[in-house]
Amino acid sequence: MSDIAVTISVLSLVAVLGLWIGHWKIRGVGLGIGGVLFGGIIISHFANQYGLKLDEHTLHFVQEFGLILFVYTIGIQVGPGFFSSLRESGLKLNVLGGLIVVLGALLVVIIHQVTEIPLDAILGIYSGAVTNTPSLGAGQQILNELGMQDITETMGMSYAMAYPFGICGILLTMWLIRLFFKINIDKEAENFDRETGKDKETIRKANIRITNANFAGLNLRDIPGFEKNGIVCTRLKREQDIFIPQADTQLQVGDILHFLGDPKILHEMELILGESIQVEASAMKGNLRTERVVVTNEKILSKKIRTLAFHQQYGVMISRLNRSGVELIPTANTTLQFGDVLHIIGSADVMDKVIEMFGNAQSKLNQVQMLPVFIGIGLGVLLGSIPFSIPGIPVPLKLGLAGGPLVVALILARVGTIGKLYWFMPPSANLALREIGIVLFLSVVGFKSGGNFVHTLINGNGLEWMFYGIFITFVPLLITGIIARIYAKLNYLSICGLVAGSMTDPPALAFANSLKENCGASALAYATVYPLVMFLRIISPQLLAILLWRAV
């Protein structure tokens, strides 16, 4: 067999063993994908004993390409929610998530300054302690740019030493906070449901009858506040006639308007127009038909709703738009993206033509457009290769293969569509590419780390590294958890989601969800902080490397 064939075969064995180890669970908690790292360490230990050498060039390519795939697909996954998570609605949770990252980084600086732990080792400990593999890749990239050599083995070993307690430490923090504050899970779930009850309906329906005679003869657009984003009138009932009103439709006393939109604006409409009444849904249907349509027609991507003119041509209206799980009230200036789910209302006679205009090809949602994938990867690698100088740093720095693809993926996922190119990726395809990437990366890192792993653990600094990893895992989580409970007044289940999300750890989220399966508090908090924290976890080791390199 050729060297390349031997290398690929051994890495495949590493992946099989590692994934098998990752499926082992103790009380529902396992290593997950991190098992691949330990599979690599085990195989490498025996390969070293028998003198088996793998092709270095192949190992290097597999490691870097796996990292690129993983980081890029992470960016595509979290991109749509990354920028929205920075908005005010999730400000409190994101500040607390950022605090966990900052506290961990400060501990790294302190430990490095008061001990003799090498820079590559402390960055590996940091990545393992926070159970974040992209952080490990980013740290390796920046140290290479700074001129450090032969760092993969040390970083991989220190990462592996800290990783196991990184997982256990999250669960231990949840348990200690629960014990310290004497938490009643059922009561916390009830409190969450009660507190969020008012906010569950971001879009509400209302039937309002016009009793204010001042609006008789005025156009629909003349209603104060009607032009505000966040409200739409989808039907007008006048005696026995039901139709979709235009902006210039003249109003009459007794008209019943069916609105969708922001509850606050709807309340204003009630005060201005007349009274809110209960009307059976069938009574407001008439000859109108409602359909749920998916945008898949490449000809209308990136176009504004007003330019399609379907409202004027067919009398059809879009009442709601769902994009990446977020429900919106569209305006005439809303730009359509691939995968947008539209709720449209119109005459049954023309509905089929309108559906054809939007595409509604459900099968396309399961297809991956490969051209945008490689365009994004190429642009990411290009961006990561552009050097920039920072005063005091001896060499120009780069975002590298971890930072470049991540930044580009975040931007492209947020943009969504450029011409006929769209960066929508089916969740199953994204997960497959992401898992392949991380398995490739961890297989090589584990194999390169395994030769001296046992010796380092028994005779070297392994136990010391493990202790510092426990410190970096536990202290930031516990401090932030207490602050979140006492000062931020967060629900305990939300704190569990915050803790899991700040460590970007799905097994921890699964554990948090199992505390109260019918309550979505943990999942909501996890999803809120995940995009920003993932970005900070990848950027933080690079900033730490620059800071500590300057201090050397």
Curated annotation (Swiss-Prot):
Assigned GO CC terms: plasma membrane
Gene Ontology molecular-function annotations: monoatomic cation transmembrane transporter activity
Q: Specify whether Transmembrane is a keyword of the entry.
A: yes
Q: Which residues cross the membrane?
A: 4-24, 28-48, 65-85, 91-111, 157-177, 373-393, 399-419, 438-458, 463-483, 492-512, 529-549
What topology does the record note for this protein and the membrane? Multi-pass membrane protein
Coiled-coil blocks: none
- Residue span(s) of domain RCK C-terminal: 190-275, 277-360
Q: Give its localization.
A: Cell membrane
Q: What PANTHER family has UniProt attached to this entry?
A: K(+)_H(+) ANTIPORTER SUBUNIT KHTT, TRANSPORT PROTEIN YIDE-RELATED
Protein name stated in the entry: Putative transport protein Asuc_0023
